[in-house]
Amino acid sequence: MKKVSPILRILGIVLCFLIPFNIISQDNSNIEKEIFNKINNYRVKIGKSKFIFNDSLVKSCRSHSNSMGINYKLEHVKNLSEVGANAEIIQLNYTTGRTFIETSDDVLDIFLDSPSHKKIIEGIYNQISIGVFVTKDEDLWVTIRFK
């Protein structure tokens, strides 16, 4: 049996840890895009114009979702003007064993079941930013901000 050098062993271990994080990051982006598409499809269905995706708020949305997920606590930003938004909706969703398409359906359905969230989605805003965070237990934390 050939000996494997210690450097190759360490490199193999590092790669094993890096690959899942890249997959999770990619899936988060896919979930964000799918939620955006679902919300826009809903708005068109009710006769509203589509939202424009606001890239400048995505980082703060992702950061907020990450913070909620790490602390396991749903909370709104106290001063939305500090993050450049006019409205915000947040959610915790359990995703175990679900695809990102199924999960995005759930996210929209839950928001539409809440009169205050539905009012924001159907409201006067024309820009939207979405940031999600998925915990190791597959809990999905969502922050959506509107301008």
What are the residue ranges of the model-derived segments?
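Functional surface patches built around histidine and acidic residues
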Residues: 23-147
